[in-house]
From Swiss-Prot:
It is a single-pass membrane protein. This is RING finger protein 24. One of its GO terms (molecular function) is zinc ion binding. The chain crosses the membrane at residues 24-44. Interacts with TRPC1, TRPC3, TRPC4, TRPC5, TRPC6 and TRPC7. A zinc finger (RING-type) spans 78-119. InterPro entries: HRD1_E3_ubiq-ligases, RNF24_RING-H2, Znf_RING, Znf_RING-CH, Znf_RING/FYVE/PHD. Signal peptide: none annotated. May play a role in TRPCs intracellular trafficking.
Amino acid sequence: MSSDFPHYNFRMPNIGFQNLPLNIYIVVFGTAVFVFILSLLFCCYLIRLRHQAHKEFYAYKQVILKEKVKELNLHELCAVCLEDFKPRDELGICPCKHAFHRKCLVKWLEVRKVCPLCNMPVLQLAQLHSKQDRGPPQEPLPGAENIV
């Protein structure tokens, strides 16, 4: 049977990395660029999500109460912890103008994204409020020092 099929001795040429055709380099380089661009897009997406979460978390105005002022209409106590406002307290003021201790408001907004007093959505109000802020500049609240 071996006489029916002649035996040929073929050897594959030894192709090194230097002898590869240019098309292979283009494919490898193109794949690397594609993976790099995908990773950049993914990083930008993650940064955008983090930025959006940061905006949602701080959708209220932070101020420090300098002194007790009647013009602020603060109701003199925090509706979340039921403690009186004191000078130098850090306050969080919702876009609906209700004020709370900043720490109380942060804990409240972690659970619910609404104002503790009027149940208005804080994020929707903040978005509407930011659109209205593009108009004439508003003066700071009397008796409060803006920290944001």
